[in-house]
Amino acid sequence: MQAIILAAGMGRRLGEYTADNTKCMLEVNGIRLIDRMLAQLFDLELERVVIVVGYEGDKLKNYILQNYPGKPIVFVENKVYDKTNNIYSLWLAREYMAESDTILLESDLIFEDNVLKSALTCKDRNVALISKYENWMDGTMVKIDENRNIINFVPKADFKYSDTESYYKTVNIYKFSKDFIVSHYLPFLDAYIRALGENEYYEQVLRVLTIIDKFGLKALPITGMNWYEIDDVQDLRIAETIFASPEERLKKIQNSYGGYWRYPKLLDFCYL
């Protein structure tokens, strides 16, 4: 089992926080996202970690090489990170991906340790980690049946508030078997890029595959586990509260500006 981390994006919405560093170099409560993620991955005793770099890639590579000497880490460079999207970053890592069972994840995530452990211990060989829709969630959604089969990927453009009861958010963590990668995912990934270009999302390939074979990819709900995706400054602030101690969480929320309604699972009665 290996891991592939997609870390080529520019993180424009974070403004000055990513002016000279990629998103995974951000600190949440004093710990960089990439340090937290690598610690969690190495705790699983994976054979290697493949990191696709792009924006400020040299800084990220130098930081990792300096702080993780001797660790089985491989770098792949996306030189056109400003003109492509994550589908191309994953395509660049296709040769590594074809060699082993793979955990695929994005570098702007923060999550508790049990999230990855649940993926590895799940008996299903090909799974997408999901979380029941909440109003703070954005991006790709899925619909599942009673047997946890993913029956549809719903891109952001097709999102409907009337359907939110049936939506689950993709956590952007996947576990794929080598067989699935070689026989299904990579051939369709290559065909999709040839047909629609490199400025797309890798989830679109999964959407096509679920249309063809709805039993190929299972959903794994991570109910009750903490996770967050950091796309902007508000996300960063929320992540800092989620992954703080109860005492520190209260202080951070009380010292913030604006209504408490922005924070997940927190009721704000000031408008009542």
Label the model's feature ranges.
Residues L65, G70-M141:
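Conserved beta-loop-beta/alpha segment of the NTase-like Rossmann-fold superfamily
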Residues M1-A19:
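N-terminal nucleotide-binding beta1-loop-alpha1 segment
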Residues E112-Y192:
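Conserved core of the sugar-phosphate nucleotidyltransferase
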Residues R207-L220:
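Catalytic donor-sugar/metal-binding loop of nucleotide-sugar-dependent glycosyltransferases
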